[in-house]
């Protein structure tokens, strides 16, 4: 008996040694071939890759060995915990997609991240299963199903969000969550994709299978301890391994690989994220505000921070130089909804030329900025950047004494008007906008309806009615000094619930299934009609400037990723149009069309154009002025700062404890410092 048992042990040991040897030689050959073409041969990178691969194989062998030792129990556990198995398979499929999308390696730390993520995402379902099998009842079965179904639906929602944004669900999703937002997301799917989603939901329901209650009940305490222990072990191994890996790379002198590894680590963390927990926390808490609050203690930038900000062109040593006299008496800003720069044919050949002929003609004829980026998303944050030259918006901070483009213009004799297509109650706009941005006159959907206008659906009034109202108001104000802003909505998903008739659509894209193209054709037509009517009404003259721009770039939608081909321009902060239209463009002759700029730059530019000194709290630059520092564009979304210039671009996580570069740490400090200063009462600003 002992001889037989010893023989089995020896056989198992020999089998393990053979497998281990085969794995080593296979991985060694693979690692050597990976660097064979490089001269001189990079020994450090070779060993780093080989050790990484072997550690991954060890982890997989351990997991496989544990499953083998418990192989007799596997059929029973598969039946008893089948819904959790379904969730696990869904997660593994999602993890595989994330790895491909984020270009993650398949080595040791990625494997640990997937194991941690697997346990994090099936943990609630396993607990519900243990509870049900311990106390079988109809109510507990319903609870089991609810936990399973909610986890599956949240995972589906996160998959869709990641597909559109390459991020897990963010808090901003819930700040704009309503029936129209849901319709907007759904409108971005084709019929086949909607059927696939419906099939997914139906499959999730049908795959909920539980065995009949058994006489032998699971030991709830032991089951909880085992599941919790394994989950904690996987997470501890992953996060410890991440830090040890960075330390090892640093000590071994592999500096470049260390910097790359820091970026990979952020992406790997997404694999380990408990999806349901993330979505629930983002729905209940605004992490961005938590990050901001923790940084309030930092009230000054260090000399090193300032040095980097000057090098990056984020800060400038020269003060803005306003013109000696106002260039215009009237400025009209037409703000489009969610329009990317590359939704215009002139910038993107994927858009048919017949879809945006008027916008193309304006771009060729008038001054514009070709590399003009959103500074924030969504609408309120984008308008905050436009009107207050700030990256971060906090509606809970009193804004009555805060500087803005409207307030500065109104203090110098210009009347301020803001016309919104949406309801005044949406996102508390009526209170927020007048308090934070300071326009003297605010008009929203309800006001237009009282004035007898019709033509609203979905989010609000359509472009044609908005422009008709604008023209009528401008006629009443003819000869006066004003700053008039019209904020449209028609490119907000779902669209087109408005549009030209099929027979009036150009044949070249009449049958085009990409609705964004049809939406942009409608935008183009309504703008053409607006400017034609303005010309006929005598509203186009040497003392009037019209500006066409967008509130922010589109942040989601399958068509967005289809139409915009350049990866850099599909980030959460991306280029939007900025066009200046006037019969007198001489004051704009110093504008460089190719410069890099963002929404925080438009307010100081317009004030300087009007001979008004911008408030010191404005962080943008005057685009009509030449600075010694380089030009740059700056944005913020989802606790990340986005930087763009002619020679570099990067994304900086604000609360990153170990930034890759000094300039990233400096930019994070700048963002939080300017947020702190922007919230100070007027008397406390130095």
Regions found by a protein language model. Give the residues of each.
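Extended aliphatic helical segments
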Residues: 18-19, 23, 51, 58-59, ...
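Membrane-interface segments at or immediately adjacent to transmembrane helices
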Residues: 235-328
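A sequence-composition feature that detects small, non-aromatic residues
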Residues: 11-12, 20-22, 31, 36-37, ...
